[in-house]
Regions:
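Transmembrane beta-barrel strands of outer-membrane/channel proteins
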Residues: 54-58, 83-87, 127-135, 172-178, ...
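Transmembrane beta-barrel domains of Gram-negative outer membranes and organellar outer membranes
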Residues: 20-154, 159-164, 227-230, 282
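Outer-membrane beta-barrel "beta-signal"
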Residues: 106-113, 260, 270-285
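Membrane-embedded beta-strands of outer-membrane beta-barrel proteins
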Residues: 69, 107-109, 156-158, 199-201, ...
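Cleavable N-terminal export/targeting peptides
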Residues: 1-28
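Repeated loop/turn-to-beta-strand initiation elements of outer-membrane beta-barrel proteins
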Residues: 51, 77-83, 115-120, 165-170, ...
Length: 285
């Protein structure tokens, strides 16, 4: 299998309709929790077929379980757009778990400003801007106030696949987002709009029988305090993940990971979510 197709299979190079697809936690093309500058596959003059995904996070006995179902598409080799519905099963700690409620809507879009290797320069990364809008959020601060709120992100991200190390290509991605959401809405809103950095690194490996794997790690800074909880401190989220692509002929991949979310966030308040298991699967038509 050609290395550029392998990278596209993993969602770590310019995606091709012939290769498998991937979606991140909120449905956008990415890893687990961070978007990448690549967009969903499409033609230069029209739209591509959709990518669908299922995403699961075991948040622990305090936070409960989070699930998301997503659909996304691309257009004109530059544009990506999609919708995701978030679902939640409440945890089992009476003093804290009622702060999380079932479900909200996620709308997202991304536009590629600069394609990777533009002007035939191998050092040029892909650069994109995007937004994520969440509605009907009723978690944490919103639950305290007993009302649903809206929050969102705007971001710029650069992604580069380094293929000079042909045996193990390296993927670097990073950017800055402005957000008024804590933990992508799972922690409700924040008191104001804040700038936060994020990034990811991945290493691509060929497996047996034309399979492929990517080992990756991500970080995403979080706003310091959720709304209505000024003494609570939310740490940077870190993930460790593996993506498995069973075959280049099938547009499907599987992700498994561990997320460091939050533990003791305030005196007497422990979310018990420092090593949470997550999984997702995405399929491109």
């Amino acid at each position: 299998m050609r290395i550029n197709c392998l990278l596209a299979v993993l969602g770590l190079a310019a995606a091709s309709p012939a290769c498998a697809q991937n979606s991140g936690w909120e449905g956008e093309t990415g890893v687990f929790i961070t978007p990448m500058a690549y967009t969903a596959p499409s033609t230069a003059t029209g739209f591509g077929l959709p990518i669908v995904g299922y995403h699961y996070l075991y948040g622990g006995k305090v936070l409960g379980d989070f699930q998301e179902i997503s659909i996304a598409g691309g257009g004109f080799q530059r544009w990506e757009f999609g919708y995701t519905r978030a679902f939640h099963n409440q945890g089992s700690v009476p003093s804290l778990s009622p702060l999380w409620h079932n479900g909200y809507n996620i709308f997202h879009s991304k536009f590629n400003l600069l394609p990777e290797n533009a002007s035939k320069k191998a050092w040029v990364p892909a650069i994109s801007i995007g937004f994520i809008l969440r509605t009907q959020v009723h978690d944490v601060g919103a639950a305290i106030l007993d009302k649903s709120v809206t929050n969102g992100d705007v971001y710029i991200v650069a992604t580069k696949t380094i293929t000079q190390s042909k045996m193990v290509p390296i993927i670097l991605s990073g950017g800055v987002r402005g957000t008024n959401a804590e933990l992508w809405g799972m922690g409700g809103n924040t008191p104001n709009f804040q700038e936060r950095a994020f990034g990811a690194v991945g290493f691509v490996f060929k497996g047996p029988a034309h399979t492929a794997f990517i080992l990756a790690s991500e970080f995403s800074q979080q706003p310091r305090h959720p709304s209505e909880l000024p003494t609570a401190i939310i740490p940077t989220t870190i993930t460790y993940a593996i993506r498995f692509v069973p075959t280049p002929e099938r547009k499907i991949n599987f992700d498994f990971g561990v997320a460091q979310i939050a533990g003791q966030i305030a005196p007497g308040v422990n979310l018990q979510a420092r090593a949470q298991v997550a999984a997702q699967v995405s399929y491109g038509f």
